[in-house]
Regions:
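Conserved AAA+ ATPase "sensor/coupling" helix adjacent to the nucleotide-binding pocket
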Residues: 92-95, 164-165, 173, 191-210
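Walker A/P-loop nucleotide-binding motif
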Residues: 41-62, 79
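Conserved NTP-binding/hydrolysis module of P-loop NTPases
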Residues: 11-13, 70-72, 81-100
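C-terminal alpha-helical "lid" subdomain
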Residues: 205-269
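Short regulatory helix/loop adjacent to the ATP-binding pocket of P-loop NTPases
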Residues: 62-66, 166-181, 190
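A short, basic N-terminal segment
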Residues: 1-42
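Mid-core helix/loop region of P-loop NTP-binding domains shared across ATPases and GTPases
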Residues: 82-86, 97-141, 150-154, 191-196, ...
Length: 269
């Protein structure tokens, strides 16, 4: 609705995990570097945590888009499954036609695939998002997958991504063997107030906004107070604030437009 008025090519504050819109705060850049390092150097298990809405999925998609062409990837987005379903999901994401009907068949097929990739000099990555919701039996299956290795290196790298509860899960005594295998850990924290300014500006620029479209300092301050620096909440209020700005025919988003957005979100700061 407001795209033409602001001269935008697309909506700047959608909540879909589009890597093009990823703003690299120091924590996001560090997480990206650690993830890419762990994958390239075949470190086995890698852990990525962050609060809801802090950009974990977007960061993961950005990492996957930056991997070389000789890296095979599988992305598991639904953790609510048992061990057999997890294995089938992984095999399907690798583009394999599933053979057999039980776990031993699935593991054998996955191992054959991994060995074939190793012979070709190709790396393999499995990303499991929302991993804090994995059941105990599935967690154990994930650990067992890491046993698929050669004498020299891990046949696949497994990224476990989730909310801070994932760290609590992995701290449990019965998951100590899995926890001990995680060699790289990174955490995404909310943005600082000065980073919120850069975040909003970055997303506007990616969407095609010119210099005449911007958020007033008091408007940004109120966005930060509402969102506490969580990108998903920033997007929600900024999208509605721009709609309010369009209704007022104002290129600059003022505090009053953010107030209108917060009213629509039924929130009070």
């Amino acid at each position: 609705m407001y795209l033409e008025f602001y001269g935008l090519n697309e909506f700047p504050f959608n909540i879909t995990p589009d890597p093009r819109f990823l703003y690299y705060s120091p924590r996001h850049r560090e997480a990206m570097d650690l993830l890419l390092y762990g994958i390239a150097n075949r470190k086995g298990f890698i852990e990525l945590t962050g609060e809801v809405g802090c950009g974990k999925t977007t960061t993961l998609r950005s990492v996957l888009s930056r991997l070389p062409h000789d890296v095979e990837t599988a992305l598991v987005l639904n953790p609510s499954m048992d061990g057999d379903q997890l294995l089938r999901s992984i095999l399907k994401d690798f583009g394999l036609t599933i053979r057999g009907n039980d776990r031993l068949d699935y593991v054998e097929q996955l191992n054959e695939f991994l060995l074939m990739q190793a012979e070709r000099g190709r790396n393999v990555v499995i990303v499991i998002d929302e991993a804090q919701d994995l059941g105990a039996e599935v967690m154990e299956q994930v650990r067992l997958l890491s046993n698929l290795e050669t004498d020299e290196y891990k046949l696949m790298q497994i990224v476990l991504a989730g909310q801070p509860e994932l760290r609590e899960r992995l701290a449990q005594h019965d998951l100590r063997q899995l926890r001990q295998r995680i060699l790289i850990r990174c955490h995404l924290s909310p943005l600082l107030e000065e980073e919120v300014i850069e975040y909003i500006t970055h997303r506007l620029q990616v969407a095609g906004a010119g210099e005449g479209v911007w958020f007033e300092p008091e408007a940004i301050k109120k966005v930060y107070e509402y969102s506490n620096g969580i990108p998903r909440l920033i997007n929600a209020v900024c999208d509605l604030a721009m709609l309010a700005g369009y209704a007022a025919q104002s290129l600059n988003i003022e505090e009053s437009q953010v107030d209108r957005a917060l009213q629509q979100l039924e929130c009070k700061v």
